[in-house]
Amino acid sequence: MHHIELYVSDLEASRRFWGWFLKELGYKEYQKWSSGISWKKDRFYLVIVQAKEPFLEPEYHRCRVGLNHLAFHAESKLQVDQMTEKLTAKGYRVLYRDRHPFAGGDGHYAVFCEDPDRIKVELVAPSC
């Protein structure tokens, strides 16, 4: 994949989440302008852009046609555990707590959370 561009409802709130999350995974800030920002790792980059007012409604919902979630590689199970603690400490919503860290199934060690627009984000440890 080359890049993904997400339109967001609140650029600053999304910048705080994605900036922190991606930097924890080794991404570096790549581009920045008044209505957007991107982070890059290796040959892939993720872009967030402030959606214009006429396009803020209806709110995003992952069960509609389109994007369900974004999944990222973790370095280890320890990184998944550490990120779970940090997500909680920062007040972000961790999903599927009752099945964590195996909400994706047996042998699928991951944390699922939501960004400020409720886009589901997954961080997956390498499988054995």
Curated annotation (Swiss-Prot):
Residues 1-126 form the VOC domain. InterPro entries: Fosfomycin_Res_Enzymes, Glyas_Bleomycin-R_OHBP_Dase, VOC. It comes from the Bacteria. Pfam families: Glyoxalase_4 (PF13669). This is Uncharacterized protein YqjT.
